Each structure stands twice: as structure tokens, then as C-alpha cells.
Curated annotation (Swiss-Prot):
Organism of origin: Saimiriine herpesvirus 2 (strain 11)
Annotated stretches, region: Interaction with pAP: 254-273
Gene encoding the protein: 17
Keyword Phosphoprotein: yes
Record key words, sorted: Host cytoplasm, Host nucleus, Hydrolase, Phosphoprotein, Protease, Serine protease, Viral capsid assembly, Viral release from host cell
Protein name in UniProt: Capsid scaffolding protein
Length: 475
């Protein structure tokens, strides 16, 4: 008859308890220990699932330690059959010998749970303080992890929290127990109940993490069959063959959602519009030119103002085109995008029309915002110093012209000293004729020579003109 030994803590004194019911007073419990009387060893506290008995409960420095034996042939046969269908149990370690029975027990029932009386009912005279010990998926007390082995000494020596003297004492007391003298376990439970308990264990929150904590609290060695450590690779399953046989597993309902075609396209268009609205980051030239490069006097020449949507030529000679706001592409909405079932057309069309109207309003608002963002800023015209004079040419360009002589002002009058006036000739009138001389022949009149005044002497009228011109020039 094959048997399996199980060992582990049913209570760790140093670890705090969440529920006061789980608290055990070690001073009172030590009076009932060691317990050499066998008590039942069952599954998940089910009375019909007795699979073995305990062969000793001991009080050690770290807590209360339990040693038991599983000797139900029916249960061991069931466990071996479960191993071939469990992928987790087949994830073995290459550093440990291949033991299917131990692998399945550590996967299915990795913890211990002690059934004892309530702390208020505990007393030294009560000899039935402990009812049974259960193998379960997760114990309520921390540190209550189980270790299965075919050898009794190997199962006890896996715990580093027990001193060597305590290990020898427990081993000497446990090995003297006659397994054949133990009562025959009654394992008559319905397999459906065990399946239900296994399903409930799958929904324990952070079960794997708690098992790792229990392993650390109990101070178990690293190389064990316990699955609360690193999981190895399966030894028998072929992944490629399994995929060809069963096909690709479809994704669950939580990973997939159904969205109408029009809604998806609207969301995609909104993302594109938001992406276009973000302006490109401004690029500024470096503050200082690299070594050996030409350094102009003006690092940042001001931009000439040329109005809205008109390109201009930079002093470096590069042409900057005009910026016009671009309208995003609009998709024509089709009536047959969304299909409706018979009897729902009237209600669905009303909702669809309202949705389309709201979507159109949102698109119009986005277009207005985008047009406002893309519109260039207006700067007032300002004068600036430039080594070249700007001569207006074409309406959209500026061309350069060299410096020329300033044109004379036409509205200014020249000074009087520079103007030469024509000489004034005064007429010479002859005296009237007399009676005595009327009979005489008329003598030809001799004209006097005209005298031209070429001196610098000025007339009073010329002085007034000069004063008037000087007054105009000085203003």
C-alpha cells in the first residue's frame, strides 16, 4: 500500500492574525501538546472526505507543527489520474525527481487548516481541543503551507524554521507510529463537490501571492514541489500539436466591443482633426554663430509687413509662401451605413438624425476653431534699418534697388540772388510841338542809350521778395 507523508505548520505564533477566532494561546495549547492521538485528515473540512490521519501535533518555537499520513487508496488513485489532465501540475522542475503524485498534491491542496475549539472555550482540562486537520487550497492563517513527500524525514527537514533538535525529536516520535493500526479512512464524497470546491478556490483573490507569503513565513527551502515558486516547462505536452488540434482560442467578450461604422469613422475623423490643429513647434536660430562663420550685424531682421495671405521675400533671398487655412476632408454620409431591424426604423432614424445634426455642429465648430488658429497674426507696419532700400515692385514681392541721389523738392523756391531779372527799360517821351517850330521841318529824334544797372544794389521790391522767400525756407 502506497502512502504519502504531509508536514507543515497549522499556526505561526509570530505572525499576527486578522480574525480573533484564529488566535491560539501557545501557553494553553502547549498543555495539550504533543498530541499523539490520531485525528482525521480530510479535504476542505468535509467530513465525508477523510483521506488519512495525523500522527502528531507538536509545539515548537515557531508555532504548532503537524505531521500526517495519507493512506486512502481511492484518493491516491484519483490524484494520479488528475495529473495527466493538469497542465499546472505537469510544470515540473528539472532539479527535482519526477513524482506525479506529489506534483498534483502540491498543486491541488497546498495548505493546511486546523479545526479547533473557540479561544473562549479553551481550557487545560479539555482533551478534545483539536477536531481535525484539513488539506485545502489556502489556509486562513499565514504560514500554514503543506509539504508532501514519500519519506517522513524529508518532509520534516524542508522547514528551516525548525531547529535540528526539534526535527530529530519530531522524527523519532512520528516514525514509531504504526500506519496499519490507524483507522481506515472513509472517502465516499461525491466528485462533484470536490469540483465545486476547486472552482471556488480559483476565485480566491491573490491566491498565488498569498501562497508565496506562506512559504516565506514558514521558511521552506527553495527546492520543493510547491507551485508558489517559479513554474517550469511542461514535459509531455506539445504546444504546436495542441494548437493544430483545437485551433486558435478566440478572444473573450471583455476584449471585443461592437461599434457602428459611422461612429467609428466619426471618431477617426475627430482624431485626425485634433492632430491637424496642433501647430508645429517654432524653430529659432542659434544665438551665436559657429566658429569661423560670418556674423551679420543684425541677427534677426524684422519681417516686412505685407498684408494677409501674401507671400514675401526674406533678406536672405528665400521666398515664404502665403498661409491659407486648409479645410479638413469631409466624408459624405451615406444612408445605408447603419442597418436597422424591421419595426425600429422610425425611432432609430430620429435618433440618427439628431446624432448627425450634433455631429455636423461639432464639425463646424472645429472648422471655425481651426481657421482661427491658422490665421496669421497681424503686425502694424514699422520702419527698420536696412543696407538696401526697398522699392515696391510686384504686389506679392519686394525687390532691392541701390541707393540713389535724393530727388529735389519741387515745392521749394530758389533764393532771389540766384535769379537774374531782365533789365527794366524806361520809355522816353518827346515834348509837344510848338507853333513856331511847326513850319520847320521835323528833326529826327535822337534816342538816348539805355543804361543797365548791373551792380549789386537791390530794389525795395527785391528785398521784400527775398524776405518772403527766407521766411518760407526757415519754416
Amino acid at each position: 500500500m502506497s502512502i504519502v507523508y504531509v508536514a507543515g505548520f497549522v499556526d505561526v505564533v509570530a505572525y499576527p492574525k486578522v480574525d480573533p477566532v484564529l488566535y491560539l494561546n501557545l501557553d494553553d495549547v502547549s498543555k495539550c501538546l504533543p498530541l499523539t492521538k490520531p485525528i482525521p485528515l480530510n479535504i476542505e473540512h468535509l467530513p465525508e472526505s477523510t483521506i488519512g490521519h495525523t500522527i502528531g501535533l507538536y509545539a515548537v518555537t515557531h508555532g504548532v507543527f503537524c505531521v500526517g499520513v495519507i493512506h486512502s487508496e481511492k484518493f491516491l488513485h484519483l490524484t494520479e489520474n488528475l495529473f495527466s489532465n493538469s497542465c499546472v501540475a505537469q510544470a515540473t522542475s528539472k532539479f527535482l525527481p519526477y513524482q506525479p503524485l506529489l506534483e498534483m498534491l502540491h498543486t491541488w491542496l497546498p495548505a493546511l487548516s486546523l479545526s479547533s475549539l473557540c479561544p473562549t472555550a479553551q481550557n487545560a482540562a479539555n482533551t478534545n481541543m483539536f477536531q481535525h486537520v484539513s488539506l485545502c487550497a489556502l489556509g486562513r492563517r499565514r504560514g500554514t503551507v503543506a509539504v508532501y513527500s514519500m519519506n517522513l524525514e524529508d518532509a520534516i527537514s524542508q522547514f528551516c524554521s525548525i531547529s535540528q533538535a526539534e526535527v530529530e525529536n519530531i522524527y523519532q516520535d512520528s516514525k514509531n507510529v504504526d500506519i496499519n493500526s490507524l483507522p481506515k479512512p472513509v472517502f465516499n464524497i461525491d466528485p462533484h463537490i470536490l469540483m465545486a470546491k476547486a472552482i471556488d478556490a480559483g476565485f480566491i483573490k491573490d491566491r498565488l501571492q498569498l501562497l508565496k507569503t506562506d512559504k516565506g513565513v514558514a521558511k521552506i527551502k527553495k527546492l520543493t514541489y510547491l507551485k508558489a515558486s517559479e513554474i517550469g516547462k511542461p514535459v509531455t505536452e506539445d504546444i504546436s500539436e495542441d494548437m493544430n488540434q483545437h485551433g486558435i482560442v478566440p478572444q473573450g467578450s471583455d476584449d471585443l466591443i461592437s461599434v457602428p461604422k459611422s461612429t467609428f469613422l466619426s471618431m477617426l475623423q475627430n482624431n485626425l482633426d485634433n492632430f491637424k490643429q496642433h501647430p508645429r513647434p517654432a524653430c529659432f536660430p542659434q544665438y551665436f554663430s559657429p566658429q569661423g562663420a560670418y556674423m551679420p550685424y543684425e541677427l534677426y531682421p524684422p519681417q516686412p509687413y505685407s498684408g494677409d495671405n501674401i507671400g514675401y521675400m526674406l533678406p536672405s533671398g528665400s521666398y515664404v509662401p502665403a498661409m491659407f487655412p486648409s479645410r479638413p476632408n469631409k466624408r459624405k454620409r451615406e444612408d445605408f451605413d447603419d442597418c436597422v431591424f424591421p419595426g425600429e426604423s422610425s425611432l432609430y432614424k430620429d435618433v440618427l438624425n439628431l446624432t448627425k445634426n450634433i455631429s455636423q455642429l461639432q464639425d463646424d465648430l472645429k472648422d471655425l476653431k481651426q481657421a482661427a488658429i491658422n490665421q496669421p497674426n497681424r503686425y502694424p507696419p514699422h520702419h527698420f534699418s536696412n543696407p538696401y532700400s526697398l522699392d515696391p515692385g510686384h504686389a506679392s514681392y519686394f525687390r532691392y534697388a541701390p541707393y540713389g541721389a535724393p530727388k529735389p523738392d519741387q515745392h521749394l523756391l530758389q533764393p532771389l540772388a540766384c535769379v537774374q531779372q531782365a533789365p527794366v527799360v524806361q520809355p522816353n517821351y518827346a515834348p509837344p510841338p510848338t507853333e513856331g517850330a511847326s513850319n520847320e521841318a521835323p528833326k529826327p529824334s535822337v534816342q538816348e542809350p539805355v543804361h543797365i544797372d548791373a551792380s549789386f544794389a537791390q530794389d525795395p521790391v527785391s528785398k521784400l521778395q527775398k524776405m518772403f522767400c527766407d521766411e518760407l525756407l526757415n519754416k
